[in-house]
Every structure is written in C-alpha cells, then in structure tokens.
Amino acid sequence: MKDAYNNLYNDFFYHRHNGFWKDCAMRKLPALLDSTRMLACGEDLGMIPACVPEVMRELRILSLEIQRMPKSPEKTFDDPATYPYLSVCATGTHDTSTLRGWWEEDRQMSERFFHETLHCEGQAP
C-alpha cells in the first residue's frame, strides 16, 4: 500500500505536472522576455520541474549558478569554470546568508572551501 501511495505521489508531482509547467512557461514567458531588452536569469536551484532546463535553453534564459549550492548532489562546492556559457554566477541568493556570513557561520565548511576549492594552505582567515 505504501508503494502505491509513493508511486501516485511521484507521478502526480514529478510527471503529470511537468507538461503543465512547460505549457504555462512557453505561453507566458515569451511575452515577458519580449517586453524588455534586459537579460533574464532563472532561479533554477533546488527541486525544479524536469522541463525547466529545456524551457530555459529554448528561451535563452540564463541559468543561476551558486558555487556553494552545486546542482550535482555529489558535490559540496562547484567549479565556476564548468558553468554553462549562458549563466550568472553569484556568491549567494536571497535565500542564503551573505558570503561573509556563510564564511563565519560554519568554520569547518569554510576550511574545506579554503583548502579544497581555493587550494590554499594553513588556516582559513
């Protein structure tokens, strides 16, 4: 019975709605994009519908890349050199602490970043 509910849940939230999200995006976003000369950036972070990368590619909406929030669950930090050409790289979002706040709030994590990503030796400042 539990598997049946899980299957229903997964189908409803991750498959059935994917087409709905894409149809709505392709109907609404072009008008918004055509109304300005500004570059659009999508906050494609966290759990997003599977159609989001495809829609963003088709509409040439820039991806948002945050080094301390890699899109791959296997990574702790991302490498900006690997980001897509059509992307914006930032140190955080409105949902995260400031760069300084992040650096100070978890010394273990900032030490890891200092050594593994910045390739620096000694104690992190």
Outline where the language-model segments fall.
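Catalytic cores of glycan-processing enzymes that make or break glycosidic bonds
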Residues: 1-125
